[in-house]
């Protein structure tokens, strides 16, 4: 270790000198950042868990990764569900042109009775065990994902997807609904959206989320691309 970040090295030696794991991040909620927001905008609850990607390649192999690319070892917990969503599902049209996809969202953990979500500290403590490879089968069964985006794998690797967010979300919603009909457990949920027409409406939802003990909200443009940046 020498105290030099990957970002600094890439600035000196070139953008891709060291590979970095793609991740789209949010900016702080303030009026300056809202200058880029187009109304009606989309508001979602900011989830309080562990950021993750569930990746399925064109051969149907499934992998779960953290926001910095570390493998989250869940012993195939999401495999059947994700394959049913994307890979040659009997409930969907033949996906001959499928080249892989990435679900972007947050991992959360249910309590032992699977009746409520654990707080961030407790839940992420269990999920960190999955990163280390020490999570138990019983704990793994209680892991869920709240998903807010779907990106084609090729675009994810390239760092940009020009398909508008609302279109990406619509395709994800269509495929997920078909999968729910054949799944005993909804291991992956789609994060609900609320349209807003101005800053005041977004701020109201933000304050309501805080009052409920949530971390906050995320405000998005419906036509926004996915990009590997904040």
Feature names for model-found ranges:
Residues 15-45:
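Charged, flexible boundary elements
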Residues 36-185:
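Covalent nucleotidyltransferase
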